[in-house]
From Swiss-Prot:
Pfam families: AMP-binding (PF00501), AMP-binding_C (PF13193). InterPro entries: AMP-bd_C, AMP-bd_C_sf, AMP-binding_CS, AMP-dep_synth/lig_dom, ANL_N_sf, ATP-dep_AMP-bd_enzyme, MenE. This is 2-succinylbenzoate--CoA ligase. Converts 2-succinylbenzoate (OSB) to 2-succinylbenzoyl-CoA (OSB-CoA). Transmembrane segments: none annotated. GO terms for molecular function: ATP binding; CoA-ligase activity; o-succinylbenzoate-CoA ligase activity. The keyword Metal-binding does not apply. It comes from the Bacteria. One of its GO terms (biological process) is menaquinone biosynthetic process. The lineage of its organism: Bacteria, Bacillati, Bacillota, Bacilli, Bacillales. It comes from Bacillus subtilis (strain 168). The gene is menE. PANTHER family: LONG-CHAIN-FATTY-ACID--COA LIGASE, NONRIBOSOMAL PEPTIDE SYNTHASE PES1 (EUROFUNG)-RELATED.
Amino acid sequence: MLTEQPNWLMQRAQLTPERIALIYEDQTVTFAELFAASKRMAEQLAAHSVRKGDTAAILLQNRAEMVYAVHACFLLGVKAVLLNTKLSTHERLFQLEDSGSGFLLTDSSFEKKEYEHIVQTIDVDELMKEAAEEIEIEAYMQMDATATLMYTSGTTGKPKGVQQTFGNHYFSAVSSALNLGITEQDRWLIALPLFHISGLSALFKSVIYGMTVVLHQRFSVSDVLHSINRHEVTMISAVQTMLASLLEETNRCPESIRCILLGGGPAPLPLLEECREKGFPVFQSYGMTETCSQIVTLSPEFSMEKLGSAGKPLFSCEIKIERDGQVCEPYEHGEIMVKGPNVMKSYFNRESANEASFQNGWLKTGDLGYLDNEGFLYVLDRRSDLIISGGENIYPAEVESVLLSHPAVAEAGVSGAEDKKWGKVPHAYLVLHKPVSAGELTDYCKERLAKYKIPAKFFVLDRLPRNASNKLLRNQLKDARKGELL
């Protein structure tokens, strides 16, 4: 049984040292240079007393130094916590404390003093000018050891740390390669944040495959199209809003592109039809932080025939649909359950959540769906109430808990509303103790929530719709509203 592997970056630098690992802005970095830069950062972190077994959080925008930081953690034997740059300070502080992080790697674009009372903050730009401490790097990765921790909001509204092992990341990369293929010409463009699994997973594919990553700090349709043509990019990870922008900007898919891996929810028919007309090879997918990226993928040849399907499981992965403890027949609706070597080890320090989420080795996703008679998966509802806005996940319970802490709010319900630009945005439905303005509630949320989680509109109700068990019926909120707060 495979229990350990040589450090991926170390071995890749030995195998193909002069091959291009990373292109970022005007920087071109070979695998040998990537290893040297990451090892140097590891030695500089060691001079700050970062040691094997520690936990370090990373709060950085997409940039070369973030890539170095992730690999430096692995070379030190340190668990890396990837923090979402869009979150509020309040949200990040919770994750730092909950994860047991002792160090925070960041830069001048973030206010370090806001975190100094609970962690040692290290500015990576200052760090790279400092002296280093000679270390013995961790030459091997233990497959069952936690490599990264990413936080995902749960239905209770409290974020949970997803423990992703080296084995999870490795088998995710291998399963993806068996599905999408690999060529020596492949270059994968990432304009999604590296703190999301869809972005981070490409870094690991890079060192495992020996493939170039073309990294962008953020998505700009003109910059991405220029980069695709300049660097002959063959693959790109995207969400629906990115794909729509690319389609608006060009009449034909760039010749070098062979795969657009689409995440963040099923694509609508008009978008898929336009992709087919313009020759965009879209691979729809279904996955989550807990599965270390995609676990189900639909190839372009099935995109119209199996409209709305997320596809079939990757090699070594399994899916099934269950309802009331019984496996469902084809087309019968139930909960999607997944199993495979890329499925997370567990939620960090969440015993009750782990007991509720795992059943005989299967992960209960909380998503509803069905399989057709050929085994293609159709996702009916993303974790029933999840709002996907511009590729970002918004859990109503998390937003509701913030609104309920406001003195004017007696009850709160949040659901998604269609939005032309973002796909969906959150709307809040409130029962009030006393009058309050939408502006006051927006300002209150700004201090406690990421910008994309703040409700776009607030509505007043006499009472929230609930079932006999007093469970909030979010799908009925829109019909129960009385008037909009201004």
